[in-house]
Amino acid sequence: MQDRFIKCIAELPKPLSDALVPMLNAEFAGHIDAQQLSTLITKSGLAESELLIALLPVAAALARPPISEFYVGAIAKGKSGDIYMGANMELSGEALFHSVHAEQSAISHAWLSGERQIEDVIVNFSPCGHCRQFMNELVEGQKVKIHLPEQQTQPLSHYLPYAFGPSDLNITEPLLTKQQHELSLDSSDPMIIEALDHASLSYAPYTNSYAAVVLETQDGATYCGRYAENAAFNPSMLPMQMALSTMARHNREFCEISRAVLIESAGGKISLVGATMDALHAVAAVELEHIVLDPE
């Protein structure tokens, strides 16, 4: 079991901890599939809603909050039945806009895993306005059920009434809808090919600035992030922050980054290169490889 889970496991009911510990191996990064979830329900004796609340300390253990020292964990439950954990992340000494919120982390985890719809979000503290707006970008976002400890489950519309969202800007395919943008580049570099694939799946209906980041560590592992825009603009999630959040979930240190690639479309209204370099240089002594593609 990973050291970061030792404290929270000790505080769980024994039937749950006994069932959960074998899952928390070196590869665990917050994903529990529907079959594993069913096993945990059976072995713990908890109802699903009780189990998901009980798992929040495990999600919070994924957090990296060097500034706030405030650990927030979130769980996104997909239509597939799988659950995806996420946690807040801050960049030490850097501006707060680099921060990733727990709900963003969990939802991006689900998105990168191929999930097409989030039905429930479970979080250990009430979602801030930023996260409520981010969740409103999802497929049927207003219907997403929000679960909080010792609170009645409510749809997002309860927390964000009279919401402004994608439909107000005539967007009919919201976040997590399958995106496939035509981007191409002649390259045999596996890392660039991976970045290209993720850029083609990014969500940028407001600027058409399709983009993705891939980070490689010294042992050859790669971690990716896609651009996820928001109708309210500021809650948009940048691909570098998503990639760093992915690394954090996998228990990797940012100093292990040995290579970083940003691919973005030349046809967009903005460029993410400046913001991407700022975040990268805050955590690693690596130069950004920046590739701009003409749309087909």
Curated annotation (Swiss-Prot):
Enzyme class (EC, first level): hydrolase
Details of cofactor binding: Binds 1 zinc ion.
Keyword tags: Hydrolase, Metal-binding, Zinc
EC number: 3.5.4.5
Annotated Pfam families: dCMP_cyt_deam_1, dCMP_cyt_deam_2
Needed co-factor(s): Zn(2+)
Residues involved in substrate binding: N88, M89, E90
Domain named CMP/dCMP-type deaminase: residues: 47-167, 186-296
Signal sequence residues: none
Subunit organization: Homodimer.
Entry function: This enzyme scavenges exogenous and endogenous cytidine and 2'-deoxycytidine for UMP synthesis.
Family: Belongs to the cytidine and deoxycytidylate deaminase family.
Protein name as catalogued: Cytidine deaminase
Organism the protein comes from: Shewanella sediminis (strain HAW-EB3)
Lineage, highest ranks first: Bacteria, Pseudomonadati, Pseudomonadota, Gammaproteobacteria, Alteromonadales
